[in-house]
Amino acid sequence: MAAATPEIQFYERELNIRRVIEECDLQRLDQALNICDLSSVERKLRLWQKLLPRIKPFYAVKCNDDPMVVRLLAQLGAGFDCASKNEVKLVLGFDVSPERIIFANPCRPVSHLEYAKEHQVSNGTVDNEFEVYKLHTHYPNSNLIVRFKSEAKEAQCPLGDKFGCDADVDAAALMLLAKSLELKVTGTSFHVGSGCSELQAYDRAIKKAKNLFKFGALLGYDMDFLDIGGGFPGSDDVKFEKIAESVNTSVQRHFPDERVHIIAEPGRFFVAAACTLVCKIHAKREIRNEAGKLDTVMYYLNDGVYGSFNCILYDHQVVIAEHYLDNAESLPHLKSLIWGPSCDALDKISEDLHLPNLNRGDLLGFRNMGAYTMPIASAFNGFEVPKTLYFQAI
């Protein structure tokens, strides 16, 4: 039996987190609360379409595979970047056509390729000769998109050590190999790194892609597909506007031909700001100095790095705690340290911050928790993952 679709609560104008907290009665809930604003996702899509009208977004499912998010983006016409059979299956379940999916994993198990073939998901990336031979054997009529390496000088999560071939030598060799095997090379792909903060990174990569298109033409390929990857910020619209301006300029310079289909793989851009995590303090410990004066307060929350805060370890995120006290200005602010609930000393959320002297049962909120959080969360030590509530503007 299929799982029931979660309830969506509707709001007018702006989502009031404090009101949500009051109505949920979190004192009775052991789990942390993940508040997901689906309208934030839709607003980001509209912003993308406004600032990057030629580039179709293919949402990176790995970033947040919540079915409610995927369903919304499917309904709004977005494409999808999938890395596995299960991600492809999830997306197809929302009546997304195969043309709206790119299998953007250059190293796929054979069973995943066979699933893609069965469901006519033909666009996929390659960055090594073994994958080319694998496709020749298991999916010879697929569309090969050569992924090359072109990293940003500043990125939250660089990817070049694992994926992407050398753009100057290896990419051409893969195209020659594909030609000899009578496979179709339809385009190129790159990823400057997740959380890119260097404006020039995209222009460098797009220029390399243009050179490969020229080489492909010499081989007789009519390449018409460019994937500029991800890396777009999720919580800084000003920075995104600057990146969009740089990308538009580069695309117009190197790919003025409108027949070339250009896509991107934004993940955190769509979902980072959509989620606010609210945690409850279930324990507290005070540390005093040699003179007996209160020096540091340690708080223990009902979520940690084995849950939503895995983003600290795996995504290099810096999370910012905010309290919901009305009289905080009148309270002393003390050096504070925040721990997760598990028995592991690695389960540290934040340190060297100053908070008012909070008590057991008080709440702390963390914004921008929609990217690379819940998909990786586990119930380590028996602590439940957060409960998610969904909201949407009327």
Curated annotation (Swiss-Prot):
- What is the stated purpose of this protein? Catalyzes the first and rate-limiting step of polyamine biosynthesis that converts ornithine into putrescine, which is the precursor for the polyamines, spermidine and spermine. Polyamines are essential for cell proliferation and are implicated in cellular processes, ranging from DNA replication to apoptosis.
Which top-rank group of organisms is this from?
Answer: Eukaryota
UniProt GO MF annotations: ornithine decarboxylase activity
> Does the keyword field hold Lyase?
yes
Residue ranges that the Swiss-Prot or TrEMBL entry lists as coiled coil: none
Q: Which gene encodes it?
A: Odc1
Q: Which organism is it from?
A: Drosophila melanogaster
Name recorded for this polypeptide: Ornithine decarboxylase 1
UniProt KW Nucleotide-binding keyword = no
So where does substrate get bound?
Y314, D315, D344
User: Which cofactor does the UniProt annotation name?
Assistant: pyridoxal 5'-phosphate
Q: Spell out which residues are annotated as carrying N6-(pyridoxal phosphate)lysine.
A: K62
Q: Provide one Gene Ontology biological process annotation.
A: putrescine biosynthetic process from arginine, via ornithine
* Site features described as Stacks against the aromatic ring of pyridoxal phosphate and stabilizes reaction intermediates, chain residue numbers: H191
Q: Where is the active site?
A: C343
Tell me the Pfam families matching this sequence: Orn_Arg_deC_N (PF02784), Orn_DAP_Arg_deC (PF00278)
The Gene Ontology CC terms held by the record are:
cytoplasm
